[in-house]
Amino acid sequence: MGIKKLTDLIEDNAPTSIKTNILKNYFGRIIAIDASTSLYQFLIAMNADVSSALTNQLGETTSHLQGMFYRTIKLISRGIKPIYVFDGSAPVLKSGELAKRQARRKEAKENLKEATEVGTNEEVQKFAKRVITVTRKQNEDCIKLLTLMGVPIVKAPCEAEAQCAEIVKKGKAWATGSEDMDSLTLGSTVLLRRLFFSEAKKMPILEFELQSVLEGLGLTQDEFIDLSILLGCDYCDSIKGIGPKRAIELIQKHKSLEEVIKHLDKSKYPLPEFFPYPEVRELFKNPNVIPADQLPPFQWKDPDVEGLNKFLVEEMGFSDVRVAQGIEKLKKFKNTSVQSRMDSFITVIKKPEDPNDKKKKVTKTPSKPSAKTSKKSSSTFKRK
């Protein structure tokens, strides 16, 4: 689930709220990861060439396990502590969007079949990406894998990104790792995108800080939620003719969707037949999640060596040598990832002011200004 054109809107109106970073700089951070979007990325990355898709001896796809195993090891080797959150049932309001996706996937399957017979390799890859979906078994496989690796998982009652946001808002994790921008709409204080992008692509991680986004856009969180609905989300259709620029102008001026609709020229901007924005707003403000304080303490345990070998090597046909190497890396870096960042426990204590200091006169010799001027470096994301 995402918000249409929200990244572009933030980039244009609040560019300083987007920073670029690299994986190693998140050492010691606890990150709540939307497992579903991660799995989708793994499947796309490894199945783009359908002829080389990874499978076991039974012909079952194993790309999701390959991606999850090695990318998780990479996170842990950088000192990051991941928590994977899996989707539960989709909200009823999302059924319309799911039906649209199913129709698009059916059409893509037909196009893929035709492209495989007479099309170019580029066409095959394009349609192959569109037919990929994450199955229940693939989710269960990954839950089993992560448990054997000693990595904590959470099964959300509904949307994974909403559960991630709850965990972050309550201070149980530092950021949400997801490609879906609605993580910000749901209140995650920090969002990391491109967390699982291959470092070979040389694409930096994008870091969004919610408070900076709100300040840059000049909105409250409630107004930001209404803006997200107006831009378009998975829960309801958007108003045709209203793009990102017009949407933020309307919310900044009228402050709420009720007032926007009240002053809108309906002949020019007719409302969609199905536009339950009050219910959608409620889903963003009070999503169906497990309260963070009711979740068990997150623990990163030692890997189950015997269990990993049985599952990955015997059942899934992985290389025993590579699995052994992966397990050794898990053991090696587990203690590293348990260490905390210095800034997580250092508190600056201000020295009490001595009233006698005010009576002392200190004469300073003015220093000459330096001939050199320092240039400010910026890590904000700029669109090329």
Swiss-Prot record:
Q: Where is this region: N-domain?
A: 1-105
Annotated binding of Mg(2+) 2, by residue:
180, 182, 234
The subcellular location is: Nucleus, Nucleolus; Nucleus, Nucleoplasm; Mitochondrion
- Which residues lie within the region annotated I-domain? 123-254
PTM statement from Swiss-Prot or TrEMBL: Phosphorylated. Phosphorylation upon DNA damage induces relocalization to the nuclear plasma.
One GO BP annotation is: base-excision repair
The prosthetic group or cofactor this protein requires is: Mg(2+)
What's one GO MF term for it? Answer: flap endonuclease activity
Primary location group? nucleus
Does the keyword field hold S-adenosyl-L-methionine? no
Provide the binding site for Mg(2+) 1. Answer: 34, 87, 159, 161
Cofactor note from UniProt? Answer: Binds 2 magnesium ions per subunit. They probably participate in the reaction catalyzed by the enzyme. May bind an additional third magnesium ion after substrate binding.
Keyword Manganese assigned: no
Which enzyme class? hydrolase
Specify where the region named Interaction with PCNA lies, as residue ranges.
338-346
Residue spans of biased composition, Low complexity class: 364-384
- Alphabetical list of Pfam families matching this protein: XPG_I, XPG_N
Q: What is its EC number?
A: 3.1.-.-
Region feature (Disordered): 349-384
Q: Which UniProt keywords are listed? A: DNA damage, DNA repair, DNA replication, Endonuclease, Exonuclease, Hydrolase, Magnesium, Metal-binding, Mitochondrion, Nuclease, Nucleus, Phosphoprotein
Q: Which PROSITE patterns match?
A: XPG_1
In UniProt terms, what function does this protein have?
A: Structure-specific nuclease with 5'-flap endonuclease and 5'-3' exonuclease activities involved in DNA replication and repair. During DNA replication, cleaves the 5'-overhanging flap structure that is generated by displacement synthesis when DNA polymerase encounters the 5'-end of a downstream Okazaki fragment. It enters the flap from the 5'-end and then tracks to cleave the flap base, leaving a nick for ligation. Also involved in the long patch base excision repair (LP-BER) pathway, by cleaving within the apurinic/apyrimidinic (AP) site-terminated flap.
The family line of this record is: Belongs to the XPG/RAD2 endonuclease family. FEN1 subfamily.
Q: Indicate the quaternary assembly.
A: Interacts with PCNA. Three molecules of repg bind to one PCNA trimer with each molecule binding to one PCNA monomer. PCNA stimulates the nuclease activity without altering cleavage specificity.
Query: This chain belongs to which protein, by name?
Result: Flap endonuclease 1
Which organism's genome codes for this protein? Dictyostelium discoideum
